[in-house]
């Protein structure tokens, strides 16, 4: 019995460490064009917000507007290079397809509904950089809420 409890404790510790590690990652850092877009915008990885900071909304209160805009420009650059965005316009269908491929979400999945809501919320924004960061922040926040609600279930 003690061994079983120890295994459960270790599993919980590993799961917590993994979630913490993911939240410390920089937004967009897992994508191919990350370094290219950083260079194109004259930024370093230190300039980019962490996933945890963005999913919790702390990026809005902890940073100046220029930092928000620069992070958004890097996000827009990656979205554009991946064919998901052209200027300030989304390719909504391609964005859904890529999101499903990346997350493994199935039809009816609340994550897809969240993505759709985030695209709808930001679609009329004209500044491509601000629009991109707000979209990414919206999706990350929704994923965090959905993850929390599924853990509590």
From Swiss-Prot:
Belongs to the PBP/GOBP family. InterPro entries: PBP/GOBP, PBP_GOBP_sf, Pheromone-bd_protein_Gp-9. The gene is Gp-9. Its main location: secreted. GO terms for cellular component: extracellular space. Pfam families: PBP_GOBP. Colony queen number, a major feature of social organization, is associated with worker genotype for Gp-9. Colonies are headed by either a single reproductive queen (monogyne form) or multiple queens (polygyne form). Differences in worker Gp-9 genotypes between social forms may cause differences in workers' abilities to recognize queens and regulate their numbers. This is Pheromone-binding protein Gp-9. It comes from Solenopsis tridens (Fire ant). Keywords: Behavior, Disulfide bond, Pheromone response, Pheromone-binding, Secreted, Signal, Transport. One of its GO terms (biological process) is response to pheromone.
């Amino acid at each position: 019995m003690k061994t079983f409890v120890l295994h459960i404790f270790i599993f919980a510790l590993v799961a917590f460490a993994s979630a913490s590690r993911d939240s410390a990652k920089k937004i967009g850092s897992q994508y191919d064009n990350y370094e290219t877009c950083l260079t194109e915008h004259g930024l370093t990885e230190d300039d980019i917000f962490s996933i945890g900071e963005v999913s919790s909304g702390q990026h809005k209160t902890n940073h100046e507007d220029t930092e928000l805009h620069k992070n958004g420009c890097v996000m827009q650059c990656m979205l554009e290079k991946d064919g998901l965005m052209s200027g300030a316009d989304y390719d909504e269908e391609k964005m859904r397809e890529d999101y499903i491929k990346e997350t493994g979400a199935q039809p009816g999945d609340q994550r897809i509904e969240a993505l759709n809501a985030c695209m709808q919320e930001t679609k009329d924004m004209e500044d491509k950089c601000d629009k991109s960061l707000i979209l990414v922040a919206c999706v990350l926040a929704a994923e965090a809420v959905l993850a929390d609600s599924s853990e509590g279930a």
